């Protein structure tokens, strides 16, 4: 039975990962060893079997005893510990939610419903580093994997509507505080049916712009507004989040020689934990819409084709409908006015499940089954 070290299991992604591992009985198949950065010797989580007290996540000697390390501790931890561990001669498998190693030549970005062949080839070749992808990229590929598999995508534009969870737990809390502050500023007016909506709107706008409005984490109002920039600014005018779309899509698909152009604008919106994306796909040939729907819907068990009608789209193609589920609905599928090779689509997915935790959990299972 493989000794598997879990690090960062208390954080947001780590907690979702733990919940999924319990649901799928993954702990039955491993000898779990839990690590901490702050509570060495403390009590580990309840996973249905005896576990040792918490070990020091910075102890190279402890980490070296493991067959697999599964970390959701973040990029700073990876940058500090990973090189020391490899230098110490550790030959185990490193599975990581953080982006630090994502684009390294000796790392594979894992999304097995899309790139299982790439993963298997890497395992056969002795690759030891398996990294979770960017959440929007993973969710887009889960939705449109069928089109990429069929070699139909010439280029793609992704305009995103990204949830607060992508920025972290404190940001989710801040979004709710912002919503609460906006509501509190006009609660009395809302209770009075005779109050004028333009007066209410003016008061809300004043609240959003006030110094007292809680923006410590986002740096700007998100509740009742949006933020048209995610991550660092790059010299070419892209945000780093936008750069990831093409870089990671092609790395996941192992398209190093002839990359598919992917670009767009990434926007933070007031959703809690589901990212949505409006996609424009340039096909390299004219394919009937019914064939496209078949390719998409048959690609993996989680993608869900939503018919392009108003009622079902409003009901099923939203963050509220999808949050907390592994379902990746894709809808609004239609040929665009630009021509028969231009396809429009809209997709939604849980940023913490297929966007983060689930590909890591499944990578562990792939290792255990070998």
UniProtKB/Swiss-Prot annotation:
List, alphabetically, the InterPro entries matched: Asp-semialdehyde_DH_CS, Asp_ADH_gamma-type, Asp_semialdehyde_DH, NAD(P)-bd_dom_sf, Semialdehyde_DH_NAD-bd, Semialdhyde_DH_dimer_dom
Instruction: Name the pathway.
Output: Amino-acid biosynthesis; L-lysine biosynthesis via DAP pathway; (S)-tetrahydrodipicolinate from L-aspartate: step 2/4; Amino-acid biosynthesis; L-methionine biosynthesis via de novo pathway; L-homoserine from L-aspartate: step 2/3; Amino-acid biosynthesis; L-threonine biosynthesis; L-threonine from L-aspartate: step 2/5
Superkingdom classification of source: Bacteria
E.C. designation(s): 1.2.1.11
Q: Where does substrate bind?
A: 162, 241, 268
* Example GO molecular function: aspartate-semialdehyde dehydrogenase activity
- Sorted UniProt keywords: Amino-acid biosynthesis, Diaminopimelate biosynthesis, Lysine biosynthesis, Methionine biosynthesis, NADP, Oxidoreductase, Threonine biosynthesis
Q: What is the main EC category here?
A: oxidoreductase
Q: Which SMART domains match?
A: Semialdhyde_dh
What does it catalyze? L-aspartate 4-semialdehyde + phosphate + NADP(+) = 4-phospho-L-aspartate + NADPH + H(+)
What does the record list as GO biological process? 'de novo' L-methionine biosynthetic process; diaminopimelate biosynthetic process; isoleucine biosynthetic process; lysine biosynthetic process via diaminopimelate; threonine biosynthetic process
**Chloroplast listed as a keyword:** no
The record places the active site at 135 (acyl-thioester intermediate), 275 (proton acceptor)
**Which Pfam families does this entry report, sorted A to Z?**
Semialdhyde_dh, Semialdhyde_dhC
Give the protein's function.
Catalyzes the NADPH-dependent formation of L-aspartate-semialdehyde (L-ASA) by the reductive dephosphorylation of L-aspartyl-4-phosphate.
Q: Self-association or partners: how does it assemble?
A: Homodimer.
This protein is called Aspartate-semialdehyde dehydrogenase
- Gene name, per UniProt, is asd
């Amino acid at each position: 039975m493989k000794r598997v070290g879990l690090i960062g299991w208390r954080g947001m992604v780590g907690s979702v990962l733990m919940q999924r591992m319990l649901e799928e009985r993954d702990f039955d198949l491993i000898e779990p060893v839990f690590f901490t950065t702050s509570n060495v010797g403390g009590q580990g989580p309840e996973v249905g079997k005896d576990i040792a007290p918490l070990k020091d996540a910075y102890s190279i000697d402890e980490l070296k005893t493991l067959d697999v390390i599964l970390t959701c501790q973040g990029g700073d931890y990876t940058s500090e510990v990973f090189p020391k561990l490899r230098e110490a001669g550790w030959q185990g498998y490193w599975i990581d939610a953080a982006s630090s190693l994502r684009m390294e030549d000796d790392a594979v970005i894992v999304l097995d419903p899309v790139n299982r062949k790439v993963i298997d080839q890497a395992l056969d070749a002795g690759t030891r580093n398996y990294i979770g992808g960017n959440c929007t990229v993973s969710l887009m590929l889960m939705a449109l994997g069928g089109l990429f598999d069929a070699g139909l995508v010439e280029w793609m534009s992704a305009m995103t509507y990204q949830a607060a969870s992508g920025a972290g737990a404190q940001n989710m809390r801040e979004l709710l505080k912002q919503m609460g502050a906006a509501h509190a500023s006009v609660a009395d007016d809302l209770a009075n049916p005779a109050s004028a909506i333009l007066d209410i709107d003016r008061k809300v706008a004043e609240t959003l712009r006030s110094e007292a409005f809680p923006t410590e984490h986002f740096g700007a109002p998100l509740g009742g507004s949006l933020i048209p920039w995610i991550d660092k600014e790059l010299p070419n005018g892209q945000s780093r989040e936008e750069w990831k779309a093409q870089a990671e899509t092609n790395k996941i698909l192992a398209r190093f020689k002839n990359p598919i152009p992917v670009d767009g604008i990434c926007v933070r919106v007031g959703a809690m934990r589901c990212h949505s994306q409006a996609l424009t796909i340039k096909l390299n040939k004219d394919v009937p819409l019914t064939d496209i729907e078949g390719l998409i819907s048959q690609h993996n068990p989680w993608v869900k084709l939503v018919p392009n009608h108003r009622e079902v789209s409003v009901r099923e193609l939203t963050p509220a409908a999808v949050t907390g589920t592994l379902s990746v609905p894709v809808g609004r599928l239609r040929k665009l006015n630009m021509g028969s090779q231009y396809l429009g689509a809209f997709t939604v997915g849980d940023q913490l499940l297929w966007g983060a935790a689930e590909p890591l959990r499944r990578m562990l299972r792939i290792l255990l089954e070998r």
